[in-house]
Amino acid sequence: MGGKTSESETVVQRFTELLDEQDYGKAADLTSYPAAASATMKQMFEGLQSGTVDYEASQVIDLDKQSAIFSMEVAWNFGEKKDWTYTLQGTVRKLAIGWRISWEPAVVMPQLTDNRTVKLVRTTAKPPPKVVDLPGEALMTEQTLNVIKIDPSRTGDLVGTTNALADAIEPVAPLITGPSLMQQLAGSQGQPIVAVNLRDGDFAILEPRMAKVPGVVMEKQPKLISADRRTRSPMLDALRKVWQDSLDATAGWGVQIFEADGRFVSQVAGYQGPSGPDIAATMDQRLQRAAEDAVVSAGTPATVVAIQPSTGAVVAVAQNSYATEKGPIAFTGLFPAGGTMELFRTVAAATKNKPPQDVTVQEAAEAATALGVGVDFKVAGLDEVTGRISAPGRSTEQVRQGAGADAVQVSPFGMAIAAAAISRGSVVPPMIVAGNPGTTDTPVPALPQPAIDRLRAMMNDGINKPETAALRGFRDVTAFAATGGADGWLLATMGDLVFAVHIADVDSGDATSRLAAVLLKSLATPEP
């Protein structure tokens, strides 16, 4: 602008400096309407709070002694490759109190008005990727869910509200009761709670009854859920994390303008690239449903984990409601190894070239890693533990030295990996996404061939024992059944499929085999 700085230039320069500092209060004082300017600029900086900005006066032209026009170049940065630039024009006038910027919201940002707001948002590619199963069918898709909440501030009778809502949703959510909702509210510190999420079909039927209940709030939210409501598994939560990671990796950004009532006006800046590829999950939904049929036949916590030993693909993970109350115990539950210690003892005997009866508890525990138990696998999206062993010098997955079988605690996931190692002849890294096997920093010793031969013989012999009689009607099945305290274990193989069964508080020695028989029968039965 050169030459002697005029009063109009001085005001514009000071205005840009204060905007750069995001000092909206002092910047507003340089306008003709400080209250409105302060409110607008406060919202702008809060809505774009992660950004930095540079306002630069590019030109100020005096029209006469009382007014001037100016231009500003504005550059926002919201992170790497997230830049937005624009040019603004405005007027500055000499008032009784001095030179002031003639206020209008568009003097700081295009398309702003007194009633509009601006916000920096994260954007996602459309359509989002879906999760497909092993055969390539849709496993999980993003759908609009109807989120049913209870807002305690909107009802004077919480007991009446919770009981009425529980009655209304009972046809689709029989486990949600008035007392269980009251328990949720007791821990919510007066905040609304989510009672249930409903698919559109269920919502359409139940909405009239729910709408009459005081304190019930109904909202629509997108969520990744199973394409088939029959498919339920803790593995879905892990796949949801993988899907979210994909969304994060392809996320874009946008500066968006909204009306006072929240209606979207336009996006004035931003970029959104293409969506990521579909997530290729390893789950086989037909096998998963068979596993679900099996676990619900048990009256105590029961889990099934099935793996394809040729690839390490986790093809099914099922828990009954009793198990789910305790969390994703198929992956993270730890239980005494019990009689399955004989498998580890067999490995130790072959490795150390000594009779099994001479193998110590400590040696058997240390041999568990050769079957993948006690190995810390890092599997995308999955929180898991294979087991905890009392091995000196091993800083992870340790417990105090126990007596006998208590020296090793195992998870159903870990025992499925052990079954896969017996079938394959070596530990195979597990995976829940095709082509993305787990990794580990834990040294995994090779299985000696004599150990492999003996372990397979134990599985072949096991199918002829009384406790596995329920499985003898199925072709090519081998099995090893054992108990650990009051719990039952079963490791089974059938061709390129292995699975581990765990049941807490078994009622008989053949409980795990009977559950496995339900699985195999369901798998052999054509679906309608």
PLM regions: where:
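Short beta-strand edge/turn micro-motifs at domain boundaries
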Residues: K81-V121
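Short beta-strand segments that buttress and anchor functional surface loops
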Residues: F70-G79, A479-G484
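Short pre-catalytic segments that frame enzyme active sites
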Residues: V108-A125, L139-I150, T155-V159, W253-K354, ...
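Small/polar-residue-rich segments within soluble enzyme cores
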Residues: S71-E73, R100-E104, K119-A125, P129, ...
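Beta-lactam-recognizing serine transpeptidase/beta-lactamase-like catalytic domain environment
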Residues: S266, T300-L334, V347-D507, A511, ...
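Short, low-complexity N-terminal intrinsically disordered segments enriched in polar/charged residues
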Residues: M1-E17
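Second-shell loop/turn segments in exported
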Residues: G2, R14, L30, P34, ...
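Short solvent-exposed beta->alpha transition segments
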Residues: E9-T10, Y24-S71
